[in-house]
Amino acid sequence: MTEIATTSGISSVGLLSVGAYRPTRVVTNDEICENIDSSDEWIYSRTGIKTRRFAAPEESAASMAIEASREAIAKAALTGSDIDGVIVATSTHFLQTPACAPIVAAALGCQNVPAFDISAGCSGFGHALGIAADMIRGGSAATILVIGTEKLSPTVDMTDRSNCFIFADGAASVLVGHSPIQGIGPTVWGSDGEQAAAIRQDIDWISHAENPAGPRPFLRMEGTAVFRWAAFEMGKVGQQAMDAAGVKPDEIDVFIPHQANSRINELLTKNLQLRPDAVIANDIEHTGNTSAASIPLAMAELLATGAAKPGDLALLIGYGAGLSYAAQVVRMPNS
């Protein structure tokens, strides 16, 4: 019997660089409150958000991904031709087809490479990172661009007092490739589809097209249900990720949870029993919840400000729509 040949790749994989793109328009809580009965103090006390960024009308998930990726590629001293895979995590590429990733790959000069999207809500970046690491270890690629990009502002009903102050726009990219030491631990991921309605689009696009005079689709969220699930279940996921990577809580230098709500992340930090001096990402304060882009955006900010250092051991936990989650232990990139 003829055996089918297979491939194998390098075992030590890590993050080479990170690039970020933040839209220029800053939206304050006071501006949000022009459409709802609320206040800057109320929003901040419950979410930790002071401001967020909204993309311009001409900007898209793809255009922001391209800008973030150009920065990541430049920081790694590479060119588009050095990249042999592009994975985009997004829920806001507003075309059924073509996917966002091939558009991004072409703009960056990544020719004839696998380029595809994944949609896993706010945990999308963790899913994409896990897939990229496994592709490289399996020999399917050597250097992969992993991107989280979202333009959530058009999906939000700005009169919905339950979530209109939460979501925002932005993109960030990491380059994944060979590392002298292991830089990405095993991915712990999963989903709970029984809670799918907790974060959802309320009307599908076909129903809207058949009744254009009716209400348009918006993003809806059951905030209390999501808060309880994330605050009390994601600590277990984080511990599983540390166990899988063979590290202990007191060895974690940096904690980068999905930037959904600073109160959730305070509870997660406590439940994980991290070191008192561990750096906790709080990019949400001035960025809002950017879904699949939030973890790499927070990573970029920590490195840019010097709060975290290259090589620091970091725990990443993404969680959100699905409900879904993905977590890894990684080493912070050099740039």
Swiss-Prot record:
Keywords: Acyltransferase, Cytoplasm, Fatty acid biosynthesis, Fatty acid metabolism, Lipid biosynthesis, Lipid metabolism, Multifunctional enzyme, Transferase. Its main location: cytoplasm. CDD domains: KAS_III. GO terms for cellular component: cytoplasm. It is an enzyme of class 2 (transferase). One of its GO terms (biological process) is fatty acid biosynthetic process. SUPFAM superfamilies: Thiolase-like (SSF53901). The active site is at C122, H258, N289. Pfam families: ACP_syn_III, ACP_syn_III_C. GO terms for molecular function: 3-oxoacyl-[acyl-carrier-protein] synthase activity; beta-ketoacyl-acyl-carrier-protein synthase III activity. Its EC number is 2.3.1.301. It is found in: Cytoplasm. It catalyses: malonyl-[ACP] + dodecanoyl-CoA + H(+) = 3-oxotetradecanoyl-[ACP] + CO2 + CoA. Residues 259-263 are annotated as: ACP-binding. Pathway: Lipid metabolism; fatty acid biosynthesis; Lipid metabolism; mycolic acid biosynthesis. The last Arg residue of the ACP-binding site is essential for the weak association between ACP/AcpP and FabH. Belongs to the thiolase-like superfamily. FabH family. Homodimer. Catalyzes the condensation reaction of fatty acid synthesis by the addition to an acyl acceptor of two carbons from malonyl-ACP. Catalyzes the first condensation reaction which initiates fatty acid synthesis and may therefore play a role in governing the total rate of fatty acid production. Possesses both acetoacetyl-ACP synthase and acetyl transacylase activities. Its substrate specificity determines the biosynthesis of branched-chain and/or straight-chain of fatty acids. PANTHER family: 3-OXOACYL-[ACYL-CARRIER-PROTEIN] SYNTHASE 3, BETA-KETOACYL-[ACYL-CARRIER-PROTEIN] SYNTHASE III. This is Mycobacterial beta-ketoacyl-[acyl-carrier-protein] synthase III. It comes from Mycobacterium marinum (strain ATCC BAA-535 / M).
